[in-house]
Amino acid sequence: MQVLSSLKTAKQRHRDCQIVRRRGKVYVICKSNPRFKARQR
């Protein structure tokens, strides 16, 4: 999982990527290709 300052580019890496907010942090999850997972500080 990458820690990024901006998740806009992380969301555009794959068409299945979606932005989720959990416990005050913003995550990008991708079910079909989990290597695109990312988290914002």
From Swiss-Prot:
Keyword field contains Ribosomal protein: yes
GO BP terms in the entry: translation
Keyword tags: Ribonucleoprotein, Ribosomal protein
Disulfide bond sites: none
Listed GO CC annotations: ribonucleoprotein complex; ribosome
Gene Ontology MF annotations: structural constituent of ribosome
Matches recorded under InterPro entries: Ribosomal_bL36, Ribosomal_bL36_sp, Ribosomal_L36_bact
Key word Ribonucleoprotein present: yes
Domain of life (superkingdom): Bacteria
Pfam families: Ribosomal_L36
HAMAP family, alphabetized: Ribosomal_bL36
Family: Belongs to the bacterial ribosomal protein bL36 family.
Protein name: Large ribosomal subunit protein bL36B
Originating organism: Neisseria meningitidis serogroup B (strain ATCC BAA-335 / MC58)
Protein encoded by which gene: rpmJ2
